[in-house]
Amino acid sequence: MVSFLAVSSLIASCSGSSNGQKSIAASDSVTASAIDSAKSIQIDFSASSVQWKGFKPGGSHEGTLPVSDGKLDIRDGVLHGGYVLLRLDSLTVENLSPEKGGNKLKEHLLSEDFFDAAKWPEVRFELTNIPAEGVVLKDLTELKGNLTLKDVTKNITIPLASIVCDPKDATYAVSSKAFTINRADWNVKYGSKSFFTGLGDNFINDEIELSFLLRTK
């Protein structure tokens, strides 16, 4: 898991932070904010990651989903757009060793029961609702974007925890607060009370807790 201490190692010229967790409502997708690819900054895959946590009666599982691609269009501290791609086959399970159930859980999560990674190998998040003139990055408290999981795209609003900038080389780090999405909104049905009755205690919570750290190169 990428430590949020890594963020504080940057020299801050703009910053803001807060704590808390929020349940995120999903709405219909909207047009993504246009970016200038030539002026966009590559996300540092080795220093960026999404943390996930799932819940069931009497327990939980957690892990990471590494970033496989992504760019942020930031010019002179102004954000114009961006996107992040995550490959599901890179998903990790951190609270179980591979030989004690970690590999089995990963295989199940990637199967047709859950995310059907063979058919839908990537998760995509693309920023929306940014005006043509952009927004000052240091002033942001949330990010709006289209989250595509399987064959469903929904717009969500993610609360931010901190934004850190290095004035010397325009390196940026953006971290979110912990937030939850409802997997039923993306038709992830296995063990869900939203789709099945009579599960008793053999259900898995619809809410998935997420948080992320994105750093640019």
What is each residue range found by the language model?
Residues M1-A12:
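Sec-dependent bacterial lipoprotein signal peptides
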Residues C14-K217:
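Low-complexity, acidic/polar, glycine-enriched regions of mature
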